Regions:
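Ubiquitin-like/PB1-type beta-grasp interaction modules and other compact soluble beta-rich domains
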Residues: 1-66
């Protein structure tokens, strides 16, 4: 399926995937993430149930603190 991931086109195998599956596919392991699908925030507790479909716009932002 083709989606927009962090403002870049991305081809990911499958017809639909959960956020958790996309994080695993992309090897994202940061503990503090902000995820949006088509502009809607996804709670961490919903990563297994929030589905991404063909044409969706997904943003995954890792929160990093520094000084």
């Amino acid at each position: 399926m083709r989606i927009e991931l962090n403002r870049q086109p991305e081809d990911i195998p499958g017809e639909t995937l959960s956020i958790r599956e996309i994080l695993k596919y992309k090897n994202y392991s940061f503990p503090n993430l902000v995820v949006r699908i088509n502009g809607k925030l996804v709670k961490k507790t919903d990563y297994d149930t929030a589905q991404v479909w063909e044409g969706d716009v997904v943003e995954i932002i890792h929160l990093i603190s520094g000084g």
